[in-house]
């Protein structure tokens, strides 16, 4: 027995087509009104965290603006920004947010560059916060003529950023200050740590340096584990902190070298 095919009556099909056509015309009319009405012409542009001017947006229809293109164009001119966000505020206002990169260290070249956790270089602004950041040494022979806003993929940068991240997240090391990181040679990579205030109070700062601390030779690989070992060693050597010259974590058994000990 053959199955009967279900067919819509022609009248219903005709009505559906008319409804869809009317709906399309209505949408087109609404879009035309939105994109041509003076009511939606941009009258105010609010720029935050930047002195850039976007006066050229005024008078343009707020719905005609391609915010992705505007954002990409603005980002090209702001290497110290991780993102430039454009927001429509109906009926006639545009807000432009410049979201700045957060520096985690300074990198030493012929001058110092700030670097964020993603490894992007940008020009420092000279704030007090930046003055307390660790300085990365040893990149000047690996990267020639660094450009702001560019991310350089180098194992030396990855190692330095990993050290900074794990040092911050280690609760045992929280009272210490990470002063510098040297990645000139990955196998011999190291960092210099300043003692916490309570330890420094027991001794006089080194005259030629003005601060007291010690070197940590960490090498490459297993950064998190090595810094955990470092934290444990410092807890054990709490009374000898000011007498530590360097700690070598590159080998199976850590080595602690004290000052004035041959």
Task: Please report, for each region that a protein language model flagged, where it lies by residue.
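Charged, solvent-exposed interaction patches on well-folded alpha/beta domains
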Residues: 1-46, 50-78, 82-262
